[in-house]
């Protein structure tokens, strides 16, 4: 009963412990890139995921698509800074090389070292999942993936045929607790006051937010007679 609902205690928005505890949510499935981005380069560092998980990663396409750690297993040097096309990785610090699937290949001056290399010398390989050309990765493979919900709502769109246009990319840095921003995104009460043009295009009384395991869906209903599609 929504009449009995309450907002979170304010400490969740300003206490450091609460903020750090909330970061576990970031280890779930995150969108990385679209298949069309491999048309120009087969290696892509994914900065937007690093910014929220703290883990530098790179998506590479060889015989298959992998999500690898973007940090050399020797002294922690970043391996890839820009999208590029290569058949292997070579660390610019000490020359350690890795195959395109992240396996250790060679290290100068380490010939004859006993017990070397080991599995620890390979790059970490994180789980990946693909839906209709959209590639996702996770640091917690037990996180639920709501593919059934996504497919039932968006399956009619041929997203795999879409082509990424980097000119349309936008980055925004917001000085706020992430929960404040998500709260704002998930509620529509502010639309008539903050977004008057959007309010004219939407049937505000029909604004819907649906939650399900692993995801949330918002539906803004167009005015009668406007171009629209069904979700």
Describe each model-derived feature in a short phrase:
Residues 1-11, 162-163:
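Short, contiguous pre-domain boundary segments
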Residues 4, 8, 75, 100-103, ...:
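Glycine-rich, flexible loop/turn motifs
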Residues 4-5, 12-52:
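Glycine/alanine-rich phosphate-binding loops at beta-alpha junctions
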Residues 11, 30-36, 165-175:
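Short amphipathic
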Residues 15-19, 121, 147, 178:
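A structural signal for well-ordered alpha-helical scaffolds and beta->alpha junctions
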Residues 27-30, 77, 190:
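Generic structural signal for secondary-structure transition and capping sites
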Residues 38-141, 151:
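Rieske [2Fe-2S] iron-sulfur-binding domain
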Residues 58-60, 70, 129, 134-231:
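C-terminal catalytic domain of Rieske-type non-heme iron oxygenases
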């Amino acid at each position: 009963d929504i009449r009995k609902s309450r907002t979170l205690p304010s400490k969740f928005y300003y206490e450091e412990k609460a903020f750090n505890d909330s970061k576990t949510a970031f280890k779930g499935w995150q969108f990385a890139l679209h298949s069309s981005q491999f048309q120009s380069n087969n290696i892509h560092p994914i900065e937007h995921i690093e910014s929220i998980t703290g883990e530098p990663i790179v998506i590479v396409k060889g015989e298959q698509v992998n999500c690898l750690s973007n940090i050399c297993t020797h002294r922690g040097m970043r391996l890839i800074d820009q999208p590029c096309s290569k058949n292997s990785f070579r660390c610019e610090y000490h020359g350690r090389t890795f195959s395109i699937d992240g396996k250790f290949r060679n290290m100068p001056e380490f010939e004859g070292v006993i017990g070397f290399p080991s599995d620890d010398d390979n790059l970490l390989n994180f789980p990946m999942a693909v839906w209709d050309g959209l590639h996702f990765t996770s640091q917690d493979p037990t996180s639920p993936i709501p593919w059934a919900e996504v497919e039932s709502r968006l399956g009619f769109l041929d997203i795999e045929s879409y082509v990424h246009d980097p000119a349309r990319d936008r980055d925004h840095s917001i000085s706020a607790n992430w929960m404040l921003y998500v709260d704002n995104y998930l509620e529509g009460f502010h639309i008539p006051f903050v977004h008057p043009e959007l309010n004219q295009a939407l049937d505000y009384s029909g604004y819907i937010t649906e939650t399900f395991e692993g995801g949330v869906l918002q539906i803004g209903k167009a005015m009668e007679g406007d171009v629209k599609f069904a979700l």
